[in-house]
C-alpha cells in the first residue's frame, strides 16, 4: 500500500503542477475587457500576438486592444459607417464587413491605414460577416441570398473588385425583407464554407466555387439566433446572441452532419454576437442589443473557457 502510494506521488505532483499552471495561465488574462463607452460593438477578431479588434456597428470605428493587459485604443476613428464581422489574415490585414453600407473595407491591422474599400451591393443590404481562406475573403449578406468574394491575386494582393456569388440549393431566404437571414460564416478549407441562418437556426455547407448549399443535419436540432461562428478542426462554436450562449457542435468528417454536444454560458454574457480564439480561450464580444444605447453605455469582451 505504501509502495503504491509512493509510485503515485510523482503523478499526483504532475497533476497538481498542471492545475496550478492552468490556474496561473487563466490569471494572466482578464475575465472581461472594457471597450469605449457607447462603442456598440458587433464583431471581434484576434490578430498577431495578444492583439484583438472590435468594430463599432454605429460608426465604423475599430478598437485595437491587448487580451493580456486589457489595454487598448481606437485604431480607426468612427466615420459614420458601420463595422460588423471582421477577420485578420496572415499578412496582418483586417477585413471588415460594412453592414447596411453595402461595403467591405480592408485595413492595415498595425496602423489602421485603409488599404481598400469595396462597394459590394446597393440597399437593401446588411453585409454581416466575413471569413478568410488563403485564396479569398467571403462576406455574407443577411438580406440578399448571395456572398461577396474578394479573390486574392498572386502573393495575396488585393483584387480590384469584388465578385458576387449567388447561393442556391437548400438555403432559402424569406420573402419578407425584414427577416434576418445568413449571418456568421467560417471556412472549412478553400472549397467549403459553413454559414448559419439566424432566423431558422439552420447551418449550411456552401460550395465556395458554385454557391450550392446543403443543410447540415443536426439531428433535428437548431441554433436559433445563430450569429458568429468559429471553426476549430471539426468543432464548431455558434454564438446564439439573444440566448446568451454558445453552442458547441461536433461535425462529422464530411461536415454534412453534426451533433450539439453542449452549451457554453457565462454570467458576463449580455447578448454576445461574435467570438474569436486566442491562447486557449474563446473571446466573445457583448453587443447588448437589448440595452438602449447611449454615449455612456458600457460594452466589453468576455473570456470564455472552451
Question: Language model features by range: what are they?
Answer:
Residues 10-19:
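Bacterial N-terminal signal peptides
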Residues 28-35, 70-77, 113-119, 163-176, ...:
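A short beta-strand motif characteristic of beta-propeller blades
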Residues 36-52, 78-94, 121-138, 170-193, ...:
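Beta-rich, blade/repeat-based domains predominating
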Residues 52-59, 89, 94-101, 138-143, ...:
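Conserved beta-strand positions in repeat-built beta-propeller and related beta-rich domains
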Residues 60-63, 102-104, 145-149, 201-203, ...:
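Structural signal for beta-propeller blades
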Residues 66-70, 108-113, 151-156, 207-211, ...:
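Short loop/turn segments that connect beta-strands within beta-propeller blades
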Residues 102-146, 167-170:
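Asp-box/WD-like beta-propeller blade repeats and closely related beta-sheet repeat scaffolds
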Residues 274-306:
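Blade-level signature of beta-propeller repeat domains, shared across WD40, Kelch, NHL, RCC1
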Amino acid at each position: 500500500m505504501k509502495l503504491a502510494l509512493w509510485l503515485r506521488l510523482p503523478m499526483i505532483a504532475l497533476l497538481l503542477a498542471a492545475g496550478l499552471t492552468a490556474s496561473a495561465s487563466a490569471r494572466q488574462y482578464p475575465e472581461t475587457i472594457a471597450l469605449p463607452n457607447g462603442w456598440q460593438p458587433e464583431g471581434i477578431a484576434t490578430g498577431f500576438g495578444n492583439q484583438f479588434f472590435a468594430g463599432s456597428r454605429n460608426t465604423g470605428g475599430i478598437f485595437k486592444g491587448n487580451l493580456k493587459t486589457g489595454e487598448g485604443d481606437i485604431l480607426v476613428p468612427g466615420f459614420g459607417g458601420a463595422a460588423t464581422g471582421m477577420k485578420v489574415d496572415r499578412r496582418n490585414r483586417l477585413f471588415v464587413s460594412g453592414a447596411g453600407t453595402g461595403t467591405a473595407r480592408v485595413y492595415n491591422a498595425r496602423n489602421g491605414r485603409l488599404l481598400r474599400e469595396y462597394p459590394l451591393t446597393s440597399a437593401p443590404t446588411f453585409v454581416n460577416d466575413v471569413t478568410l481562406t488563403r485564396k479569398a475573403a467571403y462576406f455574407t449578406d443577411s438580406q440578399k441570398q448571395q456572398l461577396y468574394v474578394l479573390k486574392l491575386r498572386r502573393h495575396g494582393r488585393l483584387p480590384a473588385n469584388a465578385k458576387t456569388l449567388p447561393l442556391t440549393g437548400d438555403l432559402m431566404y424569406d420573402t419578407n425583407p425584414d427577416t434576418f437571414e445568413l449571418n456568421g460564416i467560417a471556412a472549412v478549407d478553400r472549397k467549403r464554407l459553413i454559414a448559419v441562418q439566424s432566423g431558422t437556426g439552420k447551418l449550411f455547407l456552401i460550395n465556395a466555387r458554385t454557391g450550392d448549399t446543403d443543410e447540415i443535419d443536426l439531428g433535428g436540432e437548431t441554433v436559433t439566433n445563430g450569429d458568429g461562428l468559429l471553426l476549430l478542426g471539426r468543432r464548431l462554436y455558434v454564438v446564439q446572441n439573444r440566448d446568451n450562449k454558445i453552442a458547441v457542435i461536433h461535425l462529422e468528417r464530411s461536415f454534412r452532419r453534426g451533433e450539439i454536444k453542449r452549451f457554453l454560458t457565462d454570467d458576463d454574457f449580455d447578448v454576445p454576437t461574435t467570438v474569436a480564439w486566442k491562447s486557449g480561450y474563446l473571446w466573445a464580444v457583448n453587443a447588448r442589443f437589448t440595452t438602449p444605447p447611449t454615449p455612456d453605455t458600457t460594452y466589453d469582451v468576455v473570456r470564455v473557457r472552451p
